[in-house]
């Protein structure tokens, strides 16, 4: 998925669309998109890896994260930062909660191991 596709997905989640359901390609979103995208991209990259982050240089660059993160987590973080930049308090509150819950699910383990200490 490219940065442009991610931006459109986030703007659609926020409801920042035209009467025909098309996302707004207004300059105010495009000019902030790289910063917004790289902020969330770096945050999510480091939940999976300890190094090797390469920031997006333009909106046509591919975002190198797992399919799950691209479809289920990152759009909510990008939407959160766009809402913040628009001073859209209701959407900011909603997408902050959703992003943080979804991000937390990435770092929790898939299974729980019971450990019982025994005297030596």
Task: Label every PLM stretch briefly.
Residues 1-61, 107-120:
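Conserved short "hinge" loops at termini or chain/domain junctions
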Residues 5-9, 91-94, 98:
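Exposed alpha-helical structural elements
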Residues 39, 76-81:
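Short, residue-level hotspots on alpha-helical faces of the histone-fold
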Residues 59-69:
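Short, mixed-charge amphipathic alpha-helical segments
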Residues 68-77:
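Elongated alpha-helical scaffolds
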Residues 81-92:
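Short helix-capping/linker segments at secondary-structure and domain boundaries
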Residues 97-111:
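Short, mixed-charge aromatic SLiMs
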């Amino acid at each position: 998925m490219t940065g442009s596709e991610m931006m459109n997905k986030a703007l659609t989640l926020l409801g920042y669309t035209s009467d025909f359901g098309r996302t707004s390609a207004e300059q105010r979103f495009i000019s902030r998109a790289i910063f917004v995208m790289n902020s969330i991209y770096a945050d999510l990259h480091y939940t999976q890896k300890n190094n090797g982050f390469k920031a997006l240089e333009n909106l046509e660059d591919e975002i190198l994260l797992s399919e799950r993160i691209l479809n289920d987590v990152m759009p909510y973080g990008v939407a959160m930062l766009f809402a913040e930049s628009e001073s859209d308090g209701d959407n900011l509150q909603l997408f902050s909660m959703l992003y943080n819950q979804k991000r937390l699910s990435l770092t929790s383990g898939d299974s729980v191991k019971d450990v019982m200490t025994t005297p030596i």
